[in-house]
A protein has these predicted regions:
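Generic signal for short, ordered secondary-structure residues
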Residues: 21, 43-46, 105, 121-122, ...
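A conserved beta-strand-loop-helix scaffold within acyl/acetyltransferase catalytic domains
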Residues: 1-111, 158, 190-202
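Residue-level detector of functional hotspots within protein domains
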Residues: 10-14, 64-66, 85, 120-122, ...
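Short, Φ-rich (hydrophobic/aromatic) sequence segments
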Residues: 1-4, 153, 167-171
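Acidic/histidine-enriched, glycine/proline-rich intrinsically disordered or flexible terminal extensions
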Residues: 168, 172-202
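Acyl-donor binding region in acyl/amide transferases
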Residues: 96-162, 169
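A generic secondary-structure signal for well-formed alpha-helical elements
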Residues: 4, 8, 23, 46-54, ...
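Glycine-rich loops and low-complexity Gly/Arg-rich segments
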Residues: 13-17, 50-54, 104, 115-117, ...
Length: 202
């Protein structure tokens, strides 16, 4: 927090107080603390979010079960409950000194709860565990306004058709430059003092 501009520190404290005033119980869970009820609730949140935003749920219910079976000790969930009902949650992975934020969903609208569950609670967990990096995922201007550094996100693809591959390579050459300019623009107005002064992308 000390690295942020005073106005952003004040904004974050205000956001966190607002969420606290809802009276929700927010739990940070990993390992054996993750139960079937959490996975079931997260599945419904995920479906609700994809129905509203993307239209296609590319993860299946069994994917969540398999992740729990194979990676339980690397899963980190932040779940919010109102009385006896789960109302929102995040599904994240961690390894070593990094947390990778992945899925958010909610059954009800609580302004600011997304930031609490997806960012602030993950940062709290990272600090408490001596972790260095919270990777909040691709996209979302609101991340940069809360102290995350804008940086490139990479993926790998192979296209068999030579003409298609050449056309996409040309497009990506132009997009790469545009994205670098966008990243520098975000970091140039970052609320983190040293990022803003250096326009850092790492």
């Amino acid at each position: 927090m000390a690295d942020l501009r005073a106005s952003k520190r004040k904004q974050i404290r205000k956001e966190r107080r607002k969420v606290a005033d809802y009276g929700l119980e927010i739990e940070t869970l990993t390992g054996a603390d993750i139960k079937d009820e959490h996975i079931e609730a997260m599945w419904h949140f995920y479906r609700n979010t994809t129905a509203r935003k993307w239209g296609e749920a590319y993860l299946k219910r069994r994917t969540f079960d398999e992740l729990v079976d194979r990676c339980r000790d690397r899963l980190l969930m932040v779940m919010a409950r109102d009385a006896d009902r789960w109302v929102a949650g995040t599904f994240n992975l961690f390894k070593g000194e990094k947390i990778f934020g992945r899925y958010w969903g909610a059954a009800a609208d609580y302004p600011g709860l997304h930031f609490e569950c997806c960012y602030y609670r993950l940062i709290d967990y990272a600090i408490a565990g001596g972790m260095r990096i919270v990777e909040a995922g691709a996209q979302g201007e609101h991340k940069f306004l809360r102290g995350f550094v804008a940086k490139p996100t990479y993926s790998a693809h192979w296209l068999a058709h030579p003409s298609g591959r050449a056309a996409i390579e040309r497009y990506l050459d132009g997009e790469r430059e545009q994205m670098q300019n966008t990243i520098e623009g975000y970091n140039g107005v970052s609320p983190v003092k040293d990022v803003r002064s250096q326009g850092r992308t790492d």
